[in-house]
Amino acid sequence: MKLNLQAPINQLGYGVAGINILKALQVNDVEVSFFPIGQPQVTNQTDADAVRKGLETAQMFDPQAPCVKIWHQNQMAERIGSGKFIGFPIFELDTFSDLEKHHLDSCDELMVCSKWAKGIVDKVGLDVATHVVPLGVDAELFPPAPARQDDKTIFFNCG
């Protein structure tokens, strides 16, 4: 499968999602043409290699391939190619401005991180097929902890 991917690569929320999704697609043999939003900021060689590979593939991108854009809901106008355009906004609010609705409505489909987010898209009346695609956890960075054997809940507040 071929895919055009637009996303930032940095240490902020969208950027962390962008690099992890890029690497996951590449590991699963998707031919990803990567079009960065902003200057990629990588922190290790593995990430640099993934970005380099995506940029090299983008030189001869398939204009008919689907395009996924991981970015803000008010900036969905720009896309790569003429294939299906799938917006992947990550948001926390329960309403959208008219500008945001207009940009989201311009997408062929949407991907959102939770059932809650899909409910918001449905509630505001957007006529766009919306798919729930939860983000994952990097088990190498955050290894699973053993489950507690008692019924206590511990909260830790730092800062």
At which residue positions do the language-model features occur?
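Extended catalytic core of nucleotide-activated donor transferases of GT-like folds
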Residues: 41-122
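Hydrophobic anchor at the start of a short beta-strand
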Residues: 32, 85, 128-130
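Donor nucleotide-sugar binding/catalytic pocket of nucleotide-sugar-dependent glycosyltransferases
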Residues: 108-119, 127-144
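N-terminal pre-catalytic "stem/leader" segment of glycosyltransferase-like enzymes
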Residues: 1-66
